[in-house]
């Protein structure tokens, strides 16, 4: 089958959950299907990375929409300049934070880009067009009628908006805009032939909102190898990029509200790109992007203090694969098959989160029990081969 994937996140390098989710799935599917990937070149999707990926996947066609072509579109330059100005001069303004959260899609609807997309679809004799991530959702309006269209919804944007924006006391106008974006998201989803969510919970949310098209659940796979439990090394671990707002929000919550409640706070090591030096301190260490995640965090307690967003938390699966004990919020583990008190600990208040850290720090047997149970859940539900079979069923419809 010929599958053309349109994405705003190049599945290489593996420095974000979105990149990893795509890479591990495509790495399996390319052995059974002819895959073409269309992506916009930008500061994250560098041509150097595309060349590295092409060497790994000689059987996959990579089709970059070059940055110079995007710069010919006036709105592209206007938005980039305005955003840079606001980031420099008003980075902490609450209204700017709300505006960034309520950004209208993200891939610019230029005539040139759609020509490029539809020409590629025709040249590759495409059977299925697979669109990934919310910024690309609207493309369905411009795609040919004679191909099947599948959308992979990594994170329900309207659900993320609801959880994020309400913390900033939105104005009436902002609430009106948020609801308009929600309606547009749901309407565009119903333009696809099939919708894929990463969790059962996200599927239920969409069904409750009245989405009519078929919705299938196909969790994302990770590349972390399964390893046995390692005794606690007196450290906490967090994995995630600074550029993803729920990560930033969660770490701010932990540092400002949870850590002061700990009698002797363990060292927190943050793995992920982009974290500014201001987060580094006596009890917080920034590791940046690491090539070998296992070597960096094995033996730690994984914390997932996520307060907003939706979708699937890859960091929980990574911890479970390594038999690490996990402390998370309800939002952090939403849609995953981990159970409080058995394969993870769920704590939603600063007091409960701090108490959970201290409990595991003092109870080595509980640490091991939760880590091993988490690994069991991972093995039975989230291994790469199992998840690739599930995704292949989407194409067989």
Which residues make up each language-model segment?
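Acidic donor-binding loop of glycosyltransferase active sites
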Residues: 193, 297-311, 322-325
């Amino acid at each position: 089958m010929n599958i053309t994937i349109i994405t705003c996140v190049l599945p290489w390098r593996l420095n974000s959950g979105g990149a990893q989710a795509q890479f591990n799935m495509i790495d399996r599917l390319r052995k059974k299907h002819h895959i073409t990937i269309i992506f916009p070149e930008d500061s994250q999707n560098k041509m150097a990375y595309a060349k590295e990926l092409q060497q790994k996947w000689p059987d996959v066609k990579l089709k970059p929409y070059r940055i110079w072509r995007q710069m010919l579109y006036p709105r592209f330059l206007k938005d980039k300049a305005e955003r840079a100005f606001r980031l420099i001069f008003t980075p902490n303004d609450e209204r700017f934070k709300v505006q960034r959260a309520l950004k209208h899609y993200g891939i610019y609807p230029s005539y040139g880009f759609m020509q490029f997309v539809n020409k590629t679809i025709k040249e590759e004799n495409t059977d299925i067009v697979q669109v990934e991530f919310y910024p690309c959702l609207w493309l369905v309006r411009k795609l040919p009628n004679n191909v099947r269209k599948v959308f992979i919804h990594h994170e329900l944007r309207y659900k993320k908006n609801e959880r994020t924006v309400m913390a900033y006391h939105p104005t009436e106008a902002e609430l009106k805009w948020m609801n308009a974006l929600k309606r547009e998201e749901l309407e565009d989803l119903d333009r696809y032939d099939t919708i894929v969510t990463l969790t059962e919970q996200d599927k239920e949310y969409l069904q409750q909102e009245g989405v009519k098209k078929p919705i299938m659940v196909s969790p994302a796979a990770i590349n972390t190898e399964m390893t046995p439990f390692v005794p606690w090394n007196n450290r906490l671990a967090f994995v995630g990029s600074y550029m993803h707002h729920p990560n930033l929000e969660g770490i701010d919550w932990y540092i400002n509200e949870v850590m002061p409640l700990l009698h002797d706070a363990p060292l927190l090591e943050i793995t992920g790109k982009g974290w500014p030096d201001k987060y580094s301190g006596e009890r917080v260490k920034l590791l940046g992007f690491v090539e070998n995640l296992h070597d960096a965090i094995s033996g730690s307690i994984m914390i997932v203090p996520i307060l907003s967003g939706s979708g699937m938390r890859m960091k929980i699966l990574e911890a479970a694969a390594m038999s690490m004990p996990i402390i998370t919020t309800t939002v952090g583990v939403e849609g995953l098959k981990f159970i409080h008190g058995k394969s993870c600990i769920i704590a939603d208040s600063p007091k409960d989160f701090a108490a959970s850290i201290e409990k595991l720090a003092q109870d080595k047997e509980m640490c091991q029990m939760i880590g091993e149970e988490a690994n069991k859940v991972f093995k039975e539900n989230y291994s790469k081969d199992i998840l690739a079979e599930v995704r292949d069923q989407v194409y067989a419809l």
